[in-house]
Amino acid sequence: NIIEVTFRTAAAAGAIESIANAFPEMLVGAGTVVTQEQAKIAIDSGSKFGLAPGTDSETIGYFKSHDIPFIPGIMTPSDIQAAIKLGCEHLKFFPAGAAGGPKLLKAMAAPYANLSVKFCPTGGVSLDNMNEYLSIPEVFAIGGSWLATKAQIANKDWSAITAQVKEALAEAAQA
């Protein structure tokens, strides 16, 4: 019952508001929040959490000032340490595939295991490699745009999206 709506289009705020109103039991979050202005719009639209591809202290601070969880993006150990200093324990590993995939994430997570740091890899995660990520103890979630392609959304091909989500859930159950 969790969904992330990315701020990659002007329709994001409206989508968050519509989903939050239509499905009050669903936890709706805003992804790709890269400015404090987007953070304000996301929260005003009903977002219950936020994510970003990078670590920006102003955006993190804005979400924190509203008691709303925020997951900043990291790609290096220095990014991890910067996020920890800003009080973040849940981090988005992005772009996971291009950065080095599960092997890199395992190596980077190891020095921070005693600090309760958890990761959500996105960018390059697929049905073929998702369980490799999910097998890493420090991974709390994964993200994948393959679940709903732009073409499927544009064509309102909800049955294909539903089938892909069911396939991913079945695969994740084996992790």
Regions found by a protein language model. Name each.
Residues 3-5, 28-31, 50-51, 70-73, ...:
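Hydrophobic faces of well-ordered beta-strands that scaffold small-molecule active sites
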Residues 4-68, 77-84, 102-104:
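N-terminal active-site wall of soluble small-molecule enzyme domains
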Residues 21-26, 112-116, 175:
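Short helix-capping segments at alpha-helix termini
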Residues 35-45, 78-87, 109-110, 125-141:
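Catalytic cores of alpha/beta
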Residues 49-59, 92-101, 138-161:
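Glycine-rich phosphate-binding active-site loops on the catalytic face of alpha/beta enzymes
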Residues 63-69, 151-175:
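C-terminal helical cap(s) of enzyme catalytic domains, especially alpha/beta-barrels
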Residues 83, 87-92, 103-105, 111-117:
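A contiguous pocket-lining binding segment that forms or flanks enzyme active sites
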